[in-house]
Structure formats: structure tokens, C-alpha cells
């Protein structure tokens, strides 16, 4: 049944990292465990075409500041139902930097094993997010950038969005 659900949704896993045997092995393990199609992309190369419904797993161990800004900028221009998850994230990576990632749906820290990554990705495929409780709390209470991106919210006027944002932070009449 698990395989049937995900083949219907047509998600594709895109692992963005430095190509290596280890990265290829990880991708194969994830594809097999999740019954999902996937491909490896070199983090140093640009990427123009990202298919709708892609789940992007970006390896933070291979990203410097310049690459992080490049990928944030590139991915922020995509609004085709993509989900971004950070992989091998350093423990001390600031929450405020995590909230700058567009379409962020999960963060896997460097100390997490493959099974936790698989379980987290299974949740994301079911429509969930994968964050620590502490990070989720931060995103909910402090972030003006982290918003659920649905077609319904796109139908609101700018003023309606302003009012909702003020309500979110506790303002009243």
C-alpha cells in the first residue's frame, strides 16, 4: 500500500550534493526505501528545471555561504509545489538561517542516521514536515517568512495578508 500511495503522487527525490559513491549509495537506498524516483545533482552546478512535486534534499556539508545563497535564490523562484529538506545540517546552524530557506519542509542534522532520514522523508511524502520540536516552535512563533504555501493563500489580497500576519503575531483591534 505504501508503494501505491507514492507512485500515485508522482514525487521525485532530488539529492543535491557533491557526487560521490557515498551519495549514489544514499540515493539508491532512499529510492528503494521510499519507492520513489530520484536523481543526483552536483551542488556546484546550476539547475534550471525542477519538476513539480519534487522533494529536494540539499546536503549542507557540501555547501558554503556562496552556494547556500545561490540555492536559496534559485529555489525561491520556483513555485511548483516543491519541498526542500536540509541534509547533514550542522547542529549550530542558526534557526534564523533555516527560516530563510524557501519551501522548507524539514531539517536533518549531521548526527541523524539513514533510518531517521527515511522516516522523516516518509512523513514529508504524507504531507508532514520534519523539524525538531524546538525548531518547529521557533518557526511558528518567530518567523514571518515561514508560511504554508497553498493556492488558497495566493488568492488573498495584500491587505488581507497584512491583517492575517498582524493577527498571527497577536495584534487586535
Functional labels for PLM-detected ranges:
Residues 147-173:
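Helix-turn-helix DNA-binding segment
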